[in-house]
């Protein structure tokens, strides 16, 4: 007998009007194309103040969290998301909240995370209890997804202003900038939790930050939310301009502290929010601009949503005008369905929420009849034969329908979910699949009776017969290659020769190398491995030769072996299995003896 579960109530956002109505308010898409919208990138909670970080082949996105039904900036915690393809985002929950800082009382507002010294530092503005004014704290973690802890037990900066951003220059000097109505900076020490000297106010001149009219006390366009970075020798300060409502402007300089020159508008006044907040990165050969608006049901100035656009710098380094869209950034590569995928990795979700899972990480919960998850660009290759899911239910469960192209598209499988005796009492269920081939948008549609049906932790497809689901590592894996055991010699006078391993018929792989970043004395490369054969790969191995004296210092999404200038990168535990026609990537950092990276011709072989 299952105990009667307590009622589970969805938040106000998910009980709101259909998302399409709200999206069309900021879009010129026709109804036929609007169904493919991927902005805002999070739909089950309100998010604001995006701060992206590129680390080990993924984008980690740190956001604020607007509470449902807010009539002010009611924010109690911060959230983390990550993606390798810019469209399917994994929810990592809330590793930092006001309660992390014993000295803070309210207002978990816009912050930023930077990586240094093997750690991750999160700079955030909060209200200090002792002064009842805004101060900037710093939290630290060993992982980009936390958990974070208060690094110093007190404010780092406490002059009543907000919106910290941190930039580390090429010489290793780190700068903390912040401010509204002023713009300040300090030089951080190498420990990233203290600074030298005193805070310096950056002159807000009209030449540096544009001209505002009608407000004698604030003659420039600068409002708040600075985002400072360097690209190709140019220092950029992108900021929220001239409230209210705000647009995004930017200035450039030849040094990290100015003098700044105003360059114009990045994003015009758009969307249903009177604020905006920028975040800019380069990732996987492209440039991306993050922002927020009020596009979700019930959205507005106090209930915002983070979105992203891909853009290209002008040839002279200036930033083009970027408009809000509902289509968002294009997908990078495809998602591998044959490795375990978290249920909370989502391109678009309807009706669902997430919560911490007893097995670690997060799970999708509060699932009701008709809710669904969209996972974009799933590379099925020649076809999946079965599907497994990790589920839990304190009621009688329901069904996971596997559909292609839309929530009502072709059904390729249907998995029954039983009652398991509790919302965190997990069980793995499996079902056959037929017709899932090529690259498809996968819709996991949930059906059943009334009320909450079940929770959903992870899923995995199998190709060519039923296999045991394999574990997926955390978003920043550090795979350790299994050493090859030393064989024991056979004590016979004439040992039997060991046969040369042969590759099964139909197995083949191809690889391309792309240089995605360069600097004096080094470069970053990306290896794209594709199953070019007719049957699934169980693993792959890439080899290439560097010029004499050059070495690879780091690899992610793979395991590294070096012998002299001969480099071998093998698959990690989670990305070796590739269906025909599907791809995966591995990245590496290498030294370079010249200003231009060497020409590398890698080869790939099945493992």
Labelled PLM ranges:
Residues 80, 320-325, 329-341, 346-348, ...:
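Extracellular low-complexity, O-glycosylation-prone Ser/Thr/Pro/Gly-rich "stalks"
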Residues 26-38, 462-468, 501:
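C-terminal region of N-terminal signal peptides and the immediate post-cleavage residues
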Residues 2-36:
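Secretory targeting and sorting signals
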Residues 36-413, 421-465:
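Carbohydrate-active catalytic/glycan-binding domains of CAZyme proteins
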């Amino acid at each position: 007998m299952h105990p009667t579960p307590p009622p589970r109530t969805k938040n106000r956002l998910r009980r709101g009007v259909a998302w399409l109505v709200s999206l069309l308010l900021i879009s010129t898409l026709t109804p036929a194309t609007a169904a493919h919208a991927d902005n805002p990138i999070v739909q089950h909670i309100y998010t604001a103040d995006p701060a992206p970080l590129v680390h080990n082949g993924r984008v980690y996105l740190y956001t604020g969290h607007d509470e449902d039904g807010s009539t002010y900036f009611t924010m109690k915690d911060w959230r983390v998301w990550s993606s390798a393809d810019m469209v399917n985002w994994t929810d990592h929950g809330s590793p930092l909240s006001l309660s992390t800082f014993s000295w803070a009382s309210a207002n978990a507002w816009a912050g930023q995370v930077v990586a240094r010294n093997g750690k991750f530092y999160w700079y955030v503005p909060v209200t200090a209890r002792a002064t009842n004014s805004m101060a900037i704290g710093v939290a630290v973690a060993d992982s980009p997804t936390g958990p974070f802890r208060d690094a110093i037990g007190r404010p780092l900066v406490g002059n009543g202003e907000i919106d910290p951003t941190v930039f580390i220059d090429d010489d290793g000097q780190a700068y903390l900038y912040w401010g509204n109505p002023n713009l300040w900076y300090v030089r951080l020490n190498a420990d990233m939790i203290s600074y030298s000297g005193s805070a310096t106010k950056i002159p807000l001149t009209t030449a540096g930050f544009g001209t505002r009219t009608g407000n004698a006390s604030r003659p420039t366009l600068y409002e708040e939310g600075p985002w400072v970075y360097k690209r190709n020798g140019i220092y950029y300060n992108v900021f929220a301009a001239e409230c209210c409502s705000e647009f995004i402007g930017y200035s450039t300089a030849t040094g990290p502290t100015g003098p700044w020159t105003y360059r114009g508008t990045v994003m015009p006044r758009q969307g249903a929010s009177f604020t905006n907040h920028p975040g800019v990165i380069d990732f996987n050969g492209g440039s991306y601009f993050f922002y927020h608006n009020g596009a979700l049901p019930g959205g507005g100035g106090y209930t915002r949503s983070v979105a992203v656009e891909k853009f290209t710098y002008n040839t002279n380094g200036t930033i083009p005008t970027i408009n809000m869209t509902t289509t968002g950034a294009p997908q990078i590569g495809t998602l591998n369905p044959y490795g375990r995928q978290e249920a909370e990795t989502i391109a678009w979700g309807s009706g669902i929420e997430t919560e911490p899972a007893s097995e670690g990480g997060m799970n999708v919960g509060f699932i009701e009849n008709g809710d669904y998850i969209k996972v974009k660009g799933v590379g099925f290759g020649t076809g999946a034969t079965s599907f497994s899911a990790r589920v839990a239910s304190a009621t009688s469960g329901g069904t996971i329908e596997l559909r292609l192209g839309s929530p009502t598209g072709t059904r390729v499988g249907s998995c029954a979910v039983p009652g398991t005796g509790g919302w965190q009492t997990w069980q793995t269920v499996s079902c056959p699949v037929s017709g899932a081939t090529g690259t498809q948008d996968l819709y996991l549609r949930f059906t059943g009776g009334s009320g909450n049906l079940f929770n959903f932790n992870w899923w995995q497809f199998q190709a060519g017969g039923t296999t045991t689901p394999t574990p997926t590592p955390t978003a920043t894996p550090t795979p350790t290659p299994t050493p090859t055991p030393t064989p024991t010699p056979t004590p016979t006078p004439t040992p039997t020769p060991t046969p040369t391993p042969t590759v099964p018929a139909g197995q083949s792989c191809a690889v391309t190398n792309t240089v995605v970043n360069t600097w004096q004395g080094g470069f970053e490369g990306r290896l794209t491995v594709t199953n070019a054969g007719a049957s699934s790969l169980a693993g792959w191995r890439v080899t290439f030769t560097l010029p004499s004296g050059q070495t690879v210092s780091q690899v992610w999404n793979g395991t590294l072996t070096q012998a002299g200038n001969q480099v071998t990168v093998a698959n990690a535990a989670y990305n070796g299995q590739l269906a025909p026609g599907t791809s995966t990537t591995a990245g590496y950092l290498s030294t370079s003896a010249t200003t231009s990276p060497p020409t590398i011709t890698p080869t790939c072989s099945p493992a």
